[in-house]
Structure formats: C-alpha cells, structure tokens
C-alpha cells in the first residue's frame, strides 16, 4: 500500500491499519483463522468472482467484511472517502492489510436481512403483486438522487469509466470481434434494423472520443443489490463524480431487466441471502422466437421485453426526477445502455435463447430511442409486457 493511501486512511477514515506481512490465500479456513485471532466468528461467508464478503460477529455485535485485492481496495477506499460525508453509508471500523489484499470491516446494516432491506428485495416482493403502497419507498430513494444531482460539474474523466470506456478493448472488442452472427442483418418484430456489428462500431466510435459530461457525486454502481431502501448505499469502487447519463443507464438496465432476469440467472452468487429473486426468473423469461438464415445472413427475432409494474413505476419516477432537474440526456444514451447489455456478461456464452434476447433488446432500444430521450423511454417501457 502506498504511503499516500495509508496517510489518507488514517486522516479521512480514522482507523489504524493492522498489517500482516504475508499473503492471504483467501481460502475459507485461513479467513476464519485470521478473523478468529481478532476475536471474530464468521456468521457466513460468500465467495464471488471478484470478491469475498460476509458477516462476522464480536461481543454479540455484527460487522460486514469484504476481502479485496490491492487495486480494488484502493478504489473502494478512495470512493468511500469521496462520498462518506454526503451519502448514507456504513462506517469502516477496521482494516487488515496483507501483501496481496485487504480485509475491510464495516458497521453492519441492521435494516438488511434475508430477502429484506435492499432495493432488490423491495422489487422482488412487489413483482407479482403490489402488496403495499410502494410510492413512499420509491420517492424516498428518488428524492435522495434528486438532491444529489442538483450539484453538477462537467468532466471527461470519472470513476465509472471502468464500466464504459475501459471495457471497449477488454470486453466489447475482445468478446465480439470474431462473432460472425453479429455481422448478420437483424429484423425485430418485422422491423428492419442494422447489423449488430454496426451498432457495436458506433459504440466504439463514440467512446473513442473525449466527451465532457454532466457529472454529480454518486455511488457509481447503482444496481439493486447496492441500494438499501432506508436509503443506504454499498460498494464504493466507482464512487465519485460520475456522469448522470452513466448512473441512469446503469439503474435503468438493472431495475427493469438485468436484476430481474439476467443477473440472478448468470451470477447467482451475488444474491446470497436474497434468494427470492430466483423464484421469479421464469416469470421474466421472454416469449421469444428466432430464425437465423446463414445463406442470406439475416436474423429474424420475434419477442417482447418482460418486466413488472413496480419496476416500471420506479424508472418512470427516476425519469421524472431527471426531467424536473433539467438534466440533459441525449440520444447517446443508447451507447451507454449498449455497454450494459453487452459487457456485464459475455452474451456469446449465454444460453442461445438469452443470446438472441440480448440482441433483441439492443436493437429494440436502438430503433426506438429518439432525440427526445425521456419521452421515447417512457413510451418504450410502457410497451414492455407486464408479467
């Protein structure tokens, strides 16, 4: 760890680093042993692709812990320091530094339980039938964004770039450059569209140029697992001054489609202790038919986009909030949304039906988003199939 970061932690986070002069294997037995020496017992531990986290207890008091590699730790701490005084977040209590990673202990959030407390849980609970008046909860979350987005600056560099510009080479080009079927013309519900490769080329060209964008202080990864309905926010690796268009495209994709269908299906480990979401996957499975003509190099897809009334209500409130603040969102919104559709998961590795569903969504949004972005998005989501 750099001396600058160490000094920043002592000054801004106000915790002392406890240093271990060896590498942590990040295996369950060793993690339990390390935390036991510090007086903690593990209540549960969750191993994910990019991180390990869980809940521990000491003297009948719970804490949330994360184990992060050195660069991820640096991003998390920097983001946390940037928003901790203006956003509702849980305080960091202790940090253990190893040669290859760090363990961060956060105060435990008592409003989060099994299948309760997160925006994800609220949406899942109301997906099938709105059981209570949800407006108060939705407005509570949206009003926080409204207050945050009132103060803006224009920037061309921002933390959320790692989800957009930084994934052009590492994901968009790497994953799809050799996909022959993406060079086929696409017809969706009887309407001619472009080749998927042509849309991808537009996305690459857009992010190849520098754009000064309207930015506001934000958590930076607004998916439904990172937002508590209290409200409270988690995960700070991309927190800081981010473009509102980035925040909007991320939460639009997360709320309406990804966290209802794709994410629980292709990254189920994220939903540890929030597993009710799995019961609704079939509900959001599209009624999709497709035909690939290799001779004419054409793809015909007939489909709908499934979501729920509560998810549409949330996004409509979000759009209304942006309009009331006079936030300018242009047609380039589709390029940010395309990066969410194509670069969270490699769609080429999905089941075939989901592969073509992803292509359908991309083309449907591309064809229907107009210069009046807010109006066209409201029209688009009003045509989604409510299940």
Named regions from a protein language model:
Residues 84-99:
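Conserved HxN/HPN-centered segment at the entrance to the catalytic loop
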Residues 221, 226, 235:
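Conserved catalytic-loop position in the HRD/HxD motif
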Residues 2-43:
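Juxta-kinase regulatory segment immediately upstream of eukaryotic protein kinase catalytic domains
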Residues 23-36, 154-217:
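An alpha-helical support segment within catalytic cores of ATP-dependent transferases
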Residues 50-77:
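ATP-binding glycine-rich loop module of kinase domains
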Residues 104-113:
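Short pocket-lining segment of the protein kinase catalytic domain that shapes the ATP-binding cleft
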Residues 115-165, 199-211, 218:
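Conserved kinase catalytic-core helix
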Residues 245-322, 338-353:
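Active-site activation/catalytic loop segments of kinase-like enzymes and analogous catalytic loops
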């Amino acid at each position: 760890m750099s001396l600058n970061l160490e000094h920043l932690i002592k000054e801004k986070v106000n915790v002392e680093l406890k240093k271990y002069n060896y590498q942590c294997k990040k295996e369950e037995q060793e993690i339990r042993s390390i935390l036991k020496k510090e007086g903690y017992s593990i209540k549960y531990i969750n191993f994910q692709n990019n991180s390990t986290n869980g809940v521990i207890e000491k003297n009948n008091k719970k804490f949330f812990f994360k184990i992060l590699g050195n660069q991820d730790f640096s991003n998390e701490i920097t983001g946390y320091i940037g928003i901790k005084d203006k956003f509702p977040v849980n305080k960091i209590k202790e940090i253990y530094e190893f040669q290859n990673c760090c363990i961060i202990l956060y105060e435990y959030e008592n409003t989060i339980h099994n299948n309760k407390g997160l925006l994800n849980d609220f949406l899942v609970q109301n997906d099938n039938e709105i059981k209570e008046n949800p407006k108060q909860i939705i407005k509570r979350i949206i009003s926080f964004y409204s207050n945050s987005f009132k103060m803006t600056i224009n920037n061309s560099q921002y933390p959320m770039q790692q989800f957009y510009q930084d994934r052009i080479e590492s994901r968009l080009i790497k994953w799809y450059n050799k996909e022959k079927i993406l060079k086929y013309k696409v017809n969706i519900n009887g309407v001619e569209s472009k080749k998927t490769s042509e849309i991808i080329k537009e996305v690459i060209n857009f992010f190849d140029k520098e754009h000064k964008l309207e930015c506001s202080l934000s958590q930076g990864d607004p998916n439904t697992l990172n937002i508590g309905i209290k409200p409270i926010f988690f995960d700070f690796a991309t927190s800081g001054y981010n473009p509102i268009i980035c925040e909007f495209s991320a939460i639009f994709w997360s709320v309406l489609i990804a966290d209802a269908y794709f994410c629980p299906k292709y990254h189920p480990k994220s939903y540890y202790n929030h597993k009710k979401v799995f019961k609704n996957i079939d509900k959001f499975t599209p009624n999709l038919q497709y035909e690939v003509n290799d001779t004419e190099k054409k793809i015909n897809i007939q489909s709908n986009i499934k979501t729920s009334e509560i998810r549409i209500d949330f996004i409509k409130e979000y759009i209304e909030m942006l309009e009331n603040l006079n936030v300018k969102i242009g047609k380039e919104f589709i390029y940010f949304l395309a990066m969410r559709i194509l670069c969270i998961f490699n769609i080429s590795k999905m089941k075939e039906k989901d592969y073509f569903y992803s292509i359908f969504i991309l083309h449907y949004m591309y064809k229907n988003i107009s210069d009046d972005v807010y109006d066209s998005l409201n029209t688009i989501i009003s045509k989604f199939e409510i299940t």
